[in-house]
Amino acid sequence: MSTIEFETIGSRLQSLEAKLQAQNESHDQIVLSGARGPVVSGSVPSARVPPLATSASAATSATHAPSLGAGSVSGSGISIAQRPAPPVPHATPFGSASASSSSSSASAFASAAPATGTFGGTYTPPTTRVSRATPTLPMLSSGPGGGLNRTRPVILPLPTPPHPPVSETDMKLKIIMEQTGKLNINGRQYPTDINDLKHLGDLGNGTSGNVVKMMHLSSNTIIAVKQMRRTGNAEENKRILMDLDVVLKSHDCKYIVKCLGCFVRDPDVWICMELMSMCFDKLLKLSKKPVPEQILGKVTVATVNALSYLKDKHGVIHRDVKPSNILIDERGNIKLCDFGISGRLVDSKANTRSAGCAAYMAPERIDPKKPKYDIRADVWSLGITLVELATARSPYEGCNTDFEVLTKVLDSEPPCLPYGEGYNFSQQFRDFVIKCLTKNHQDRPKYPELLAQPFIRIYESAKVDVPNWFQSIKDNRLRANGDPTLQRATATGSAIGSGAGSLAGSGSGSAGGAVKYGRATTYAGQSPTNPQKTIKPTQIPSYQQQQSQFFMQSATQLPQTTTTTPTATTNCFGGSGNGNGRGNGSGGSGNGSGSSSSASPLSPPSAGIGDLNRLYRKSPFMQRKLSNGSHHPHYKYNDESPKKESMFSSIGQSILRNLTTSPFSQKKHNSTATTIPLPHNNQTLITDAATAAAAAATATTPPNIAATVLTTTPTTTPTWRLPTENSQAYDSCDSSSNATTTTLNLGLSSPSPSLPRKQFPTESPTLQLTSQQQQQPQRLQPGNQSPIVLQRFYHQQNQLREKEAAERYQQQRQQPPVGVTSTNPFHSNYVPPPPSTHSTSSQSSTQSTCSQIAINPASISPSSGSGTGNMAGLGIGSAPASGLGAAGHFGAGGTGEQLQYQPLPIAAEATGTSPTLQSRSPEQQSDYGGNGNMVASKLSKLYARRQLLGQSSSSGASNSSLDGCSREQHDAGWFNTLAGAMKRQFATYVKTQLNSTATSPVASSMDRDQEPVHPQPPAYRSVVNNGSGGKSYYYRTLSAASSSSNTSQSTSPTTEPLPGGGTSSFLRRYASSGPGGSISTPPSPHILAGLDRRHRSPDPPPRYNRGQSPLLLRKNLLELSGQPPGSPLLHRRYVSASPPLPPPRRGSESVPGSPQHFRTRIHYTPEPQRRIYRTIDQ
């Protein structure tokens, strides 16, 4: 320690002693009243010293108030800090509180000014160390408690930061925390724990979190829960709280989504809201069509009112108005949601510009020169939203980046509603949009002006059936997806019939009931007992009811199939006792009617639901559809393989899209009353068809039989669905279980359900097509849509089919052909294929099931005799007359061939071959050949025709036989003869011809004519038959190979194809086309006629796993078909079982145990440059 420091400390101690001494000596002179001020004011930075003696020196004693700390005592205007006084040991660190009393004059203070105390570091020791006692000084400024009172604790005036004002966010959080865990549902408050919510599925996700569907167990209500993570991000937290704050306060606005409560937890925040069905963004993607102006009128009314409410009541601007934030529910309510980036308006202006979606952002929010904007920015967003919904595309859809969008918003003219192109918007709507999209925000109207616009005035009072429109969109989507939730009709069969239109019949008894929107079915399904039950209008959408209904329906439906009670009874939906199925026509009358009403495959007959499941279970298209009726209600895709599903989803979609839109896609069945194409009301069509079918059935069959059929259908085994009273409308396949029963019950008189259907034939197939297109367009199934997966699936299916075909062929060779003369141009002969064949391949299994069903009935039918022209005829030729008898399994009399995809051209050719063949009824038309109508039936079959598979046997069979048996039989012949053609077209043949063989209608007709008696080998029939046709067509269209001939599996009644005419389509195309005029080369089914050809883009060459190379397939094909061993075609090539496999694209794609797998492992090295074998996308 340096000498100076030592001296400093010493001097300070000395001065302290002097000060204490002076204090004690002058104690009696202290004025009590004067000294307390400084002490009391210890926490105040500058304490006022009460009036001191006029002598400035008196202030010295006042300075003893230690409590003053750093403050400056303004006694006589002199700051304590200016005094050179060593601090009291326990004084504040600032030390300025201790003042030296050694100087009695103001000058002493001045001289010591630099001193700041012990810790000040600038203390200048006084020149004199002698302390000056000041006993004579009046210490007015310090009272008894003043000065350095050792007994008084020192109050340290430590600098405490001013308490931050409570932020708006914190206040909101505090208010919200008080409400956490309290849910207000249906007017009642439930204290709820997060464990009381059961997760049902995801609804969607966005920037701030995800929205899930949950069941509130206490109230048994399904709600939507928005789950948002709580991050340390202040912006994110602010957004969450803003959203919560707005929805909690907006409970009194019917145009804003209701908040039922919230849970604020450490990791996340859950906002519980009423469940809405969907947002308009998703709706637009589903419908792929513009939203009608009437609906947009209601959307505008709701949105403008909601925005106006936010502004007027809460001073909030939404800032994110767009289709995805406008929700709709099944009751037609339209509401605004998502207030996460809403902003408070200060003086009606908002400041932040980062919030919102670029495409909907107003120009003033983008332009940096305009720092503030107001609610009119939301008006612009509303205008853009309306243009997008009205045209089904974004006005800025060409832009790839937000920057391009923003540039376009700023620099280009504002968007407007287009003219022409079928856009017929009212002038009021156009004017409204123009006002909303005024670029200069000063000229843009605010909410009061908008609410006075004629467009809003009109739709505030107009009655618009929003629920029905919304339901139709959902139904179309569900149909396309085969979505099980479209259980409406499916679940109850009758419901099916009711479809959207008839639902009324189903649950509500009145078309108008909630049911009319299609949901009713679901509910009806819930309690068969209470068909009248309508959706209960809770705030919470019917989803809550839906869940239970979903399973119940399945169960309910199943029983329906089993129930022996008459249709009326079974039909909880007012399927009405009428066997007619008109029973409530709309209701889809009972099972039977359900069946018939299910003109669309979407709605399988209710009675046959069980079988339907069975039949369709393997069909990728039908799986979902039937899931309701499935025996395992909880397993949506019964027995479906994921691979298949995925394949269908992608391929099915594309094919369906193409085919459904094409005339071919029509189902023949629809021809029944369904002639009226109801775009969205398949059910209606179905119902009509059902009614007509029922009528036809009744007419055709003896009254007692008709009644029996109707009643029994539900009861009878679903071996092959009877059309049930109305099944005529459906393919036999659809009604197969019922059909069988019915056929049997009917006895000979009405052996086949198709017979009644035949009557429908009167209507032109085209009409049916229309209906079908509408019904079928959506059978898409979600799943793995990878082309590779799908292709592999197809190839595997082809292989299976080929094997099956071979086996069947052998079996059939051994079986005597069933000779049945058939009036039908299509062969009536059905050779029942061994049931095993049907199920052999998964694809064919569905069809095969149908075909089996069809086949058995077919055999029965002919026996019944009523099946005019035999089942084989399937009522094609005679079906019109026999109606019932000909029904043929698939209700497509000999139309088995009528694969959905049968090329239209074939119909013409077939026509040439057998004009008679062309049946008026779609069912009669053969898919491939026989009829100009084939196209329609083709698609129908695609869906409903799976049933036809069996039937197609007659005409299809002939063709099919080419496919299946004849192919094998004639393979040697045609392979040898057509070696050149085969070489050129082998791959195509393998992939597509197998399918197409069945297609050639002409050949089949010729065959029919020439050899009606010969049954076709199942394999062929499979190809020919819709069996494979229905499915395979589907497949074919997707990938010709997929449906290989076996698919049909139906025993086509078709006689064996003649070598020339009967040859497989492939040969036919090449060899036959030249020689036989009669055989106009029928386009192969998968090669849709020229009309459809454009829809089918070539498949990329598939990558094969072991055993799947085309060469191997061909080898198997030739071997199976009995090709002579020395065939020039193969000989040299097949030294090894198959050519070396190409390396896999990725190691993960190789099959374990395959050569690629080994190679992958052996040659794997981390350095890419050394991957010798992996040059493909590695």
From Swiss-Prot:
Signal peptide extent: none
GO cellular component: axon; cytosol
Active-site residues, as the UniProt record annotates them: D320
UniProt-listed GO biological process terms: antibacterial humoral response; axon extension; axon guidance; basement membrane disassembly; carbohydrate homeostasis; cellular response to arsenic-containing substance; cellular response to cadmium ion; chorion micropyle formation
Pfam family, one: Pkinase
Post-translational modification: MAPKK is itself dependent on Ser/Thr phosphorylation for activity catalyzed by MAP kinase kinase kinases.
Enzyme Commission (EC) number: 2.7.12.2
Catalysed reaction equations from the record: L-seryl-[protein] + ATP = O-phospho-L-seryl-[protein] + ADP + H(+); L-threonyl-[protein] + ATP = O-phospho-L-threonyl-[protein] + ADP + H(+); L-tyrosyl-[protein] + ATP = O-phospho-L-tyrosyl-[protein] + ADP + H(+)
Protein name: Dual specificity mitogen-activated protein kinase kinase hemipterous
Taxonomic placement: Eukaryota, Metazoa, Ecdysozoa, Arthropoda, Hexapoda
